[in-house]
Amino acid sequence: QLTMSFEKVFEIAPIFRAEPSRTNRHLSEAISIDFEEAYVDYNDVMKRIEQIINQVILSMQEFSKDNHDVDFVIPVILDTIPQYTYADLLEKIQATGAKSQWGDDLYPAQLSKIGITGFYFIKDWPIGPKPFYVKVSKDNPKISESFDLMYGDLEISSGSTRIEKKSELEDRMKNKGMKIDTFSYHLNVFDYGVPPHAGCGIGLERLMMALTGIENIRDTTFYPRDVDRLTP
C-alpha cells in the first residue's frame, strides 16, 4: 500500500510467528528484509535479490581481507541465480517415486533428493498454496506470478507480483474462504488507486545460514526464541 506514495519501500525489522516447529531452521522471532516496488513484476524482484546477495558476498570478501580468522568459506559472486519452474521440480520429485501432485508444497526432504545445491529460484507456483494477494499469471490461470528463493532445500525468501485491483483481491479472498469484512482496513486503501507492484521478504537468519554454512539457525542470532524459549 505504501507504493501509492513511495515508488520503492523497504524495511529490516523483526517478525513474530506462532511457530510450532522444532527444527534447525525455524524461529518464533526473526529478522526479515522486506521490499515492495511499484511498476515492476516478480522477475524484477528476483533480479533485485541477485543484486542484494552479490552485494552481501562482496562485503564478506572485503571483510575477510582484514580479518583472517574467518572460519568459513566466503562464497563467490554469482553470475546469475538459476530458475526452475514449480512444474519442472514437481516432475523431478515425482521421478524419485514421491506421490506429490500438482498443487502440493515441495518439501525439504523431497528437494534434497533431487540434488540441487546452492541458490536457485522456484517460480510459477500454483495459485492454490499462495497468499490471496499474489497475482495470477496472464498466460495460465492456474499459475501465480510468484517465487521462492532456495539454498539447497532451505527456503530463504518468498515473493511475487501483487494484486493491485480491489475487485480481484476480493474474489481471491472469497475463493480462499476469507471474511472480506474483517479486511476492510486493508481493502479500503485500494479505492484510491494502487499501482502495479511486486515485492518479497528475505529471512536474514536463513540467508546467514546459506552464506556461512551454519547448520542451526539458533547460531545466527544472539537470543534465539523458538517454541521452547521466550527469554532472554
Describe each model-derived feature in a short phrase.
Residues 2-3, 7, 17-21, 53-61, ...:
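Hydrophobic/aromatic-lined pockets within catalytic cores
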Residues 5, 35, 89, 122, ...:
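A residue-level signal for conserved active-site and pocket-lining positions in enzyme catalytic cores
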Residues 21-29, 137-147, 161:
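A glycine-rich, aromatic-flanked flexible loop/lid motif
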Residues 46-152, 174-195:
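Metal-assisted phosphate- and nucleotidyl-transfer catalytic regions
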